[in-house]
Amino acid sequence: MTEEKTPKQIVELLDKYIIGQNEAKKSVAVALYNRYRRLQLPKQMQQDITPKNMLMAGPTGVGKTEIARRLAKIVDAPFVKVEATKFTEVGYVGRDVESMVRDLVEEAVRMEEKDQFEHVKMQATKKANNRLVKLIVPGIKRENRENSMQQMMQMLSGNFNMNQPQDNEEVTDAIRNERLSVADQLNKGLLENREVTIEVEQAPKVNPMGDMMGQMGIDMSSLMGDLMPKKTVKRTLKVSDAREVLIQEESKKLINYDSLYQRAIERTQQNGIIFIDEIDKITAGNKKTSGEVSREGVQRDILPIVEGSTVSTKYGPVSTDHILFIAAGAFAESKPSDLIPELQGRFPIRVELNALTQEDFVKILKDPQNSLLKQYIALLKADGIKLVFTQEAIDRIAQIAFEVNQGTDNIGARRLATILEKLLEDVLYEGPDMNMGEITITQKYVDQKLSDIIINKDLTKFIL
């Protein structure tokens, strides 16, 4: 996180995507900025300052998940969303709670790898182009016993790569000149559609046993991969596609993965955010039926992770002491006090998110960056159609969404997506075949498309 992103600036960035819920935005912004403050303190004091985990309570579709997800993107932090109901108590079949930390590390590794790929891209592209030149204009092979034995040893060790031209080739002046010509054409982009045959590493098959080992922090695929040669398959690709494959290969050779994994672990420990959804579903307020896995048992399993513990992963041990946990739930049939007291104490910041009003729906349709209306306008623009919504139509859509939520299940802003899809289904279907330059959605059109469904309560439940 950078020093420039103060709590106020974080809230301003969240405002671009999320309407209302100012209290929740302020709380997450302060919790996040406290991480930066902690890193400015002496090392000894840093260890004693733990993150102020947060508990969000509010109906579905009001922005709980979106606030956390956008927050992670703003500060470029590893983020995972998990559902509390997916976990089972230790001793039962199912995902153990430590898997959320392993998922977070995987996300951090992916982010670090992406950063490193960008860092070495120019160098990797140059190497990939050199390999393409040698694949398009191969040298004259010179086989001898020594080289054959060397290749056999490389294959047994898993290091042999058919894409990599071998040293035992003879390059004549004619071949050298042709390669220079091909290299020049590649640089000018003249050979992008030409086909070339390369060897591509075959994706390993999913092994259920490997998944079980992964939950224990053991990477079976890595262990077996070091012992067994990598399987490859021949593929004929366009030069443009083959280059991307070779760039990936060359990038991996240029990256120091031991160092990358260490940085990923550090990134997880200092910046990681875990969003635990549906925490209300594992409270005592939701009574357990006979034979059901103990909900309190899951809470007690989550407790040490949130309190701060060390989890074994295939990249190394990860401390959860400074990971920020955000728990959320509707709490329609229970309340936060139904959580076990120890877990309540680990979420000192409580935020209640408000149900969305009709005015909120109007703003959600129009104001956010890449709002729903902007998305549909952009989609139909691809067909050469200019889609226009009148203000009266927008107000009517918001009114319908609010009334349907009140009359049936309240699913918050998600109702808008359902209504818009029904409203625009004919336009989306016929769009590619229409020659109309502009389509205006009026209040009258909204009423025509949706009035029958709204009047019939049974249809409303099934369609909207």
From Swiss-Prot:
Cell compartment(s), UniProt:
Cytoplasm
| One of the record's GO molecular function terms | ATP binding
Q: In the UniProt record, does the keyword Transmembrane occur?
A: no
A family per Pfam: ClpB_D2-small
Stored InterPro entries = AAA+_ATPase (IPR003593), ATP-dep_Clp_protease_ClpX (IPR050052), ATPase_AAA_core (IPR003959), Clp_ATPase_C (IPR019489), HslU (IPR004491), P-loop_NTPase (IPR027417)
Q: Which family does it belong to?
A: Belongs to the ClpX chaperone family. HslU subfamily.
Q: Which SMART domains match?
A: AAA (SM00382), ClpB_D2-small (SM01086)
Organism encoding this protein: Lactobacillus johnsonii (strain CNCM I-12250 / La1 / NCC 533)
Q: What is this protein called?
A: ATP-dependent protease ATPase subunit HslU
Q: Which SUPFAM superfamilies match?
A: P-loop containing nucleoside triphosphate hydrolases
General function of this protein: ATPase subunit of a proteasome-like degradation complex; this subunit has chaperone activity. The binding of ATP and its subsequent hydrolysis by HslU are essential for unfolding of protein substrates subsequently hydrolyzed by HslV. HslU recognizes the N-terminal part of its protein substrates and unfolds these before they are guided to HslV for hydrolysis.
Q: Name one GO cellular component term.
A: HslUV protease complex
Q: Spell out the subunit comment.
A: A double ring-shaped homohexamer of HslV is capped on each side by a ring-shaped HslU homohexamer. The assembly of the HslU/HslV complex is dependent on binding of ATP.
Gene Ontology biological-process entries? protein unfolding; proteolysis involved in protein catabolic process
Locate the residues binding ATP: 19, 61-66, 277, 342, 414
Where is it predominantly found?
cytoplasm
Taxonomic superkingdom? Bacteria
Give the residue range of the signal peptide.
none
Alphabetically ordered keywords of this record: ATP-binding, Chaperone, Cytoplasm, Nucleotide-binding
